[in-house]
């Protein structure tokens, strides 16, 4: 029997799994990136499923009518080359069809694929991270000011706070 393909909104309990896929692909998802995407656009983070089991993901965030963003586009390796990624990609583009400009976080080895869809390389983004010490230089430098900062989980940030 043929498996049923579907695309649906990501659930909260699927976020850790999709984050682990991103890390396996060599992406550097920030802490709570997916929750922040989900909080910014409640309709913009999807999983592709076979018989309701997630096999792929895409974040497609509509910030406003002028700008949207696509990232987290992943199909698990064992399900690639079956057209599932194309269907997920087309779903995302359809969602952003009335947006003036779409930004894209692209895997370097897929740049040619994205150019075939009309995307042009604009810039390279590097994400830096520090592994290790609890005694970070920034914390020492701003030790007296740290009490004025409040750190909150990404899914607790209101959509009004992140709208352009």
Language model segments and positions:
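Conserved active-site tyrosine of GNAT-family acetyltransferases
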Residues: 114-119
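A conserved beta-turn-beta hairpin within the catalytic core of GNAT-like acetyltransferases
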Residues: 62-70, 80, 122
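Conserved catalytic-core motifs of GNAT/GCN5-like acyltransferases
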Residues: 99-105, 120-134
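Conserved beta-strand in the GNAT
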Residues: 47, 53-61, 68-74
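Conserved acetyl-CoA-binding loop-helix of GNAT-fold acetyltransferases
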Residues: 75, 81-94
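Short amphipathic alpha-helix that is part of the acyltransferase structural core
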Residues: 1-33, 125, 134-164
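Short loop/turn motifs at secondary-structure junctions and domain boundaries
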Residues: 36-42
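Conserved GNAT acetyl-CoA-binding A-motif
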Residues: 70, 95-108
């Amino acid at each position: 029997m043929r498996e049923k393909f579907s695309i649906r909104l990501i659930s909260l309990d699927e976020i850790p799994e999709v984050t682990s896929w991103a890390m396996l692909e060599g992406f550097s998802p920030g802490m709570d990136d997916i929750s922040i995407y989900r909080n910014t656009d409640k309709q913009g983070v999807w999983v592709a499923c076979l018989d309701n089991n997630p096999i792929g993901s895409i974040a497609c965030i509509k910030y406003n009518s002028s700008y949207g963003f696509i990232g987290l586009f992943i199909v698990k390796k064992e399900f690639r080359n079956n057209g599932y990624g194309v269907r997920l990609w087309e779903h995302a583009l359809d969602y952003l069809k009335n947006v003036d400009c779409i930004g894209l976080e692209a895997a370097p080895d897929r740049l040619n694929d994205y150019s075939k869809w009309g995307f042009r390389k604009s810039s390279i983004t590097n994400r830096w991270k520090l592994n290790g010490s609890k005694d970070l230089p920034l914390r020492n430098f701003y030790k007296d000011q740290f009490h004025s900062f409040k750190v909150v989980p990404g899914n607790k940030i209101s959509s009004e706070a992140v709208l352009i």
